[in-house]
Amino acid sequence: PQEQMTMEAYTTITGEIPEGGVSPVLYEIQRSRFLAYAVHAEDEEAVRTWLQGVKKEHYEARHVPYAMVLGARSDRQRSSDDGEPGGTAGSPILEAIKARNMTNTAVAVVRYFGGIKLGAGGLIRAYAHAAGLGLDAAAKIRMTPLRPLYVQIDYDLLAAAERYIREASVQTEETSYADVVTLTLLIPTGDIELHQRALTDLTAGRARYRLGAQRYVAVPLA
């Protein structure tokens, strides 16, 4: 199907929005304190509920602007200045997410005003910097479209096949041991032929193959 052809890898933050919240990253400039929260998000409603919790916790803060980018193709983008001058808060937060090519990600920045006005340019820089710090501190994963290649082999070929998989750094899932061994390899669509050829050579043509449907697999980012 067409859909399978167009799946593209994307980077996001690990995990659901945690019940206990996430630890914010603090950035201070000219006595204004900015607390940046970055979370994984796939649903606008869930983000709004989470935002209410952040605002409740920081009820003394004057502004809690936010931005979110949702969808594997980053096609849903929202931002709010939450009372800051137009374009000085939500927009730079959104740009910080986009600059890192991230999606399914929401960032809220709580600002405690320190009595010194930062000016429009100062606000834009401060919100962009705070959002960037929050995003950079968050644990991230790369959601990568891979296809399962099921490889059936006899037991006498297992050691050689496992050595090949290790050396080729192929991601695997559970192996099933029955009358024959079924290895599950997770491979980018473009590399399937290459690995099939190598395994066919290695097993002198005794390996049998079946392809599964392409799906997203989470690969942790260091």
Regions found by a protein language model. Give the residues of each.
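Short amphipathic alpha-helix segments
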Residues: 152-170
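C-terminal regulatory domains involved in ligand/effector binding and gene-expression control
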Residues: 5-87, 210-222
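Short glycine-/aliphatic-rich beta-strand segments at the starts of folded cytosolic domains
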Residues: 140-157, 183-185
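Short, structured loop/turn "capping" segments at alpha-beta junctions
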Residues: 103-107, 134-146, 159, 174-175
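Terminal, non-globular segments
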Residues: 185, 191-192
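Short amphipathic alpha-helices in soluble, non-transmembrane regions
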Residues: 162-167, 195-203
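Conserved short beta-strand edge segments in small beta-sheet-based binding/regulatory domains
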Residues: 172-177, 203-220
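Active-site beta-strand/loop microenvironment that shapes enzyme catalytic pockets
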Residues: 89-137
